C-alpha cells in the first residue's frame, strides 16, 4: 500500500505539471502573435482544457483504452461511455499497483488536451472561434484516442511485427505531438495564411509578435511541464527510470536550443531568439518517444538534430506558403517524426527492424490523421466556414469574436 501511495502521488504531481503546460502554451502563443488577438488565444486554450477533459471523460478514455471490448480487433474498440473502474476494480492491482484508475484518467486527459492546443497555435489570428471549437472537439473526440489506442491501448501498433517487435513511443512524440501537428498542417492548408504574411511574389514577410519576453516565459514553463509529461510516462516513481528520463529530457531540450540557434546563425547570420526557443521545444518533442531508452549522449544528438529540423522546417513551410505563427508544426510534427524514428537509430531499441516499424507506424498514423483531419476540416468549413473576413482580421479577433480588448485602453502601435 505504501508503494502504491508513493507511485500515485508522483503521478498526481506529474499530472499537475502537464496541466501547467497549458499556461506555457498560452504564454508562447500570446507572445508570438499580435496584441489584438490575445483574448482569442486565451479563450481557445481555456476551451481546449475544459472541452478536452469532458470529452475524454465521456468517451475518449474508453475509446483509447477499450480493454477487451474490440469492435475491429486491434484497430478500434470502445469500453462504453463515462468513467467506471468496474466491479472487479482493485487499486492495489490496477496498473501493477502503480497508480489508481482515477489518476490514470486525469493524467491521460491532460495529454488529450495537448493535441488540440497544438492546432490552436498554428491557426492563430485568422480562424473563426466557432470553427476552431468544432474542429478541436472532433479531433480530440475521434482522431487522438483512436491513434493512441493503437499502441497505448494495446492495439496493432504494440505488436506490429510480433509480441517482441512493436512500435515504441514512450510519451507521445507521434501519438500526441505528431497527431496534433498533422491536424494543424491540414487546417492551415485549408485556412490560408494571415493577411500580409506573403507579398505578391510569395516572399514571406515578418509579422512580429507582441511580447517576446512572455513567449520566453512560456517556453520555460513548458520545459518545466515536460518533467511531468515524460517523468509521468514512466507510470511509477521508480527512482532510476524517472531520473534517467528527466536527464535525457533536459539534455535534449538544451541541445535542441543550441542546435537551432547555431544553425540559424549559419543560415541567416542572425541569433534568432524565437528559433532558439522553438529549438528547445523541438528537442523536448524529439526525446519524448525514447526518453527512457536513451543514454545522455544519444539524447544530445536527438536534441541537436531536432534543433536543425526546426530551422529547416520553418523554411519549408515558408516555401510552401503555409503560415504557422508560433512554429507549432516544425516543433510538434517534424520533430515528433524525427524523435520517433530516432528510437530505431539510437538507444536500447536501435536496429533496422525497429527503425522500419517506427517508420511504418509514423506513416500509418500520419495518413489516418490527414484523412480524418481533412474530413473534419471540410465538414466544419461547409457548415460554419473557417476564416474570419479581412475586416475582422484587421481589427483583431479580440474585438471581432469577443467584443473586447485584452489590455483596455493600453495599446502598442
Residue ranges and their predicted role:
Residues 1-413:
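Hydrophobic alpha-helical transmembrane bundles of multi-pass membrane proteins
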